[in-house]
């Protein structure tokens, strides 16, 4: 059994002392873990995080002007999130769930989650440093998520949840300012994650171990920082995966800020494959 749920906390009315967004994210995840235990679905499979002004530095809308006056809001969020995982004895490093974190212009800290009775199998990308192993350059606490996760379903089916994926090699952003090349690199990373997921699936119990996935068959959400870049992104996807691929024809495109200010596009995806022989 799986549980789908939501948490929304307003920074205006639900502040956690003087800790700001860090305290709010800690509270949200602490409450989440308690709710999951009560529901009998303690294992997080996939999480979606939406933060107002994710690249900002304080309460001002002008993040650039505030640069250097404090910790970036995404890094504040990461601090509270990781501490909540640690306090609740949840896997904050190896075994962390698949997740994404996107920026919205205004609103509450919004978390959507999918949880189950059985822990998922985490999947990493060999082209990238695991997010939870990022160096301190990216903040005092690393992001808490795996690149993807495999979750067993009934009837031998297996679900693949791919975290938000972008133009990062190792731990560094590549192709800054070039949305076409960022899209190509993102697709290369998706291929690497799917290949790693197929290798990992072989370690599942039968009949789930026969499940296999294809990038072209993924259902995806494409987050774009600038709406004017949508056409260029779609052209690259059509060129690389084929304009008639399921990936291209069923993609959902949303405008959002990405967790790093130099990233222009991020793609998350999911799929279900049959493990039945």
Which ranges hold each PLM region?
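N-terminal presequence-like segments and the immediate start of the first folded domain
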Residues: 1-51, 55-218, 224-277
């Amino acid at each position: 059994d799986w549980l789908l749920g939501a948490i929304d906390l307003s920074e205006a009315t639900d502040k956690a002392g003087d800790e700001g967004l860090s305290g709010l994210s800690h509270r949200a995840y602490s409450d989440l873990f308690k709710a999951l235990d009560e529901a009998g679905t303690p294992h997080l499979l996939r999480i979606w995080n939406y933060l107002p002004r994710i690249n900002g530095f304080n309460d001002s809308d002008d993040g650039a002007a505030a640069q250097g006056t404090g910790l970036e809001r995404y890094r504040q969020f990461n601090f509270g999130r990781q501490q909540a995982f640690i306090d609740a004895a949840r896997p904050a490093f190896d075994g962390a769930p698949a997740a994404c974190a996107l920026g919205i212009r205004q609103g509450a800290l919004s978390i959507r989650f999918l949880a189950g009775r059985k822990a998922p199998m985490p999947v990493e990308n060999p082209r990238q440093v695991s997010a939870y192993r990022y160096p301190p350059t990216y903040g005092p606490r690393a992001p808490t998520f795996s690149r993807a996760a495999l979750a067993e379903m009934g009837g031998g089916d297996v679900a693949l949840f791919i975290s938000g994926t972008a133009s990062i090699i190792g731990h560094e952003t590549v192709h800054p300012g070039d949305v076409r090349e960022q899209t190509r690199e993102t697709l290369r990373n998706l291929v690497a994650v799917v290949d790693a997921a197929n290798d990992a699936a072989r370690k599942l119990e039968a009949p789930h171990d026969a499940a296999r996935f294809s990038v072209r068959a993924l259902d995806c959400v494409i987050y774009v920082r600038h709406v004017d870049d949508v056409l260029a992104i779609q052209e690259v996807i059509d060129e690389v995966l084929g304009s008639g691929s399921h990936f291209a024809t069923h993609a959902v495109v949303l405008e959002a800020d990405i967790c790093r200010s130099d990233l222009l596009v991020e793609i998350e995806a999911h799929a279900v494959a049959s493990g039945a022989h």
